[in-house]
């Protein structure tokens, strides 16, 4: 949500949720601050915190969610082939379910602190690229 709200702030408002509320990893806060994004809320919200809200899109970002586009076996937007599939699933929040696959969860990275921080940078940059591309394709980023 921080990336979307930073780079597409005039056109999109995003909220972020995790399966359970948890502290935000300090390495994520650090790599976001490298590109000018200040993280002020240091806890993720749980999905249940949004139970009464509706959204245009519910987006799952990380590749280990197990969802892929039609070309790769499911019905969703695919970050691997960068295309919107024709049958987006509806969610309980009223929005279309969209998956970006192929982005590894940096919180599961192993190695030195520098290697893990680099995994966060890579995920940050990949997520930014696919979100900007996605919102352009759904006409939210056209002047």
Q: Language-model features: where?
A:
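Redox-cofactor binding/interface segments in oxidoreductases and associated redox assembly factors
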Residues: 60-61
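Short, charged/polar "capping" segments at the starts of alpha-helices
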Residues: 22-25, 65-69
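Conserved acidic residues
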Residues: 56
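Phosphate-binding/catalytic loops
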Residues: 67-143
């Amino acid at each position: 949500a921080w990336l979307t709200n930073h780079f597409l702030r005039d056109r999109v408002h995003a909220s972020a949720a995790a399966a359970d509320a948890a502290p935000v990893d300090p390495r994520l806060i650090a790599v976001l601050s490298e590109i000018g994004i200040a993280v002020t809320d240091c806890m993720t919200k749980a999905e249940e915190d949004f139970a009464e809200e509706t959204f245009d899109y519910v987006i799952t970002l990380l590749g280990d969610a197990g969802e892929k586009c039609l070309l790769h076996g499911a019905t969703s937007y695919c970050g691997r082939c960068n295309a919107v599939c024709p049958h987006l699933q509806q969610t309980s929040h009223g929005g279309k379910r969209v998956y970006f696959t192929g982005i590894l969860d940096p919180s599961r990275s192993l190695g030195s602190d520098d290697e893990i921080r680099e995994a966060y940078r890579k995920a940050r940059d990949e997520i930014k690229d696919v979100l900007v591309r996605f919102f352009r394709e759904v006409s939210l980023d056209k002047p």
